Amino acid sequence: MAVRVLIVDDAAFMRIMLKDILSKNGYEIVGEAENGIKAVSQFQEVKPDVVTMNITMPEMDGITAVKEIKAYDPDAKVIMCSAMGQQATVVEAIQAGACDFIVKPFQADRVLEAVRKAVG
């Protein structure tokens, strides 16, 4: 059965890019969200195997969304995808419960490696 992925980013082109990379490699995209609030509700609704999560988004940022998702499901696998690659941001994301951090702009190989690692 295909690994199910929820893609969260406020930029439509980033969602399209991630969807393209992942679907071409056998992953099933089960949902998309453009902010943290929608990410949390989509997660609860579709129960994906992995989430790709941006940090800077309107209404609720990605760090807060990760905390809420992990509170709902401690086993959730969330990969942060952000242009904010400063060490403090990466540490904050990992402490919030993210299992990996990809810095934008990213290579397709890096995304695939992170998803493979997350689902183990």
Model features per residue range: what roles?
Residues 84-85:
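Short, conserved "switch-loop" micro-motifs in signal-transduction and mechanochemical regulators
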Residues 46-52:
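Active-site beta3 strand of CheY-like receiver
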Residues 57:
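Receiver (REC) domain active-site loop signature in two-component systems and cognate sites
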Residues 35-38, 61-64:
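Acidic catalytic/metal-coordinating carboxylates
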Residues 106-115:
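C-terminal output helix
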Residues 12-31:
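Two-component/phosphorelay signaling modules centered on CheY-like receiver
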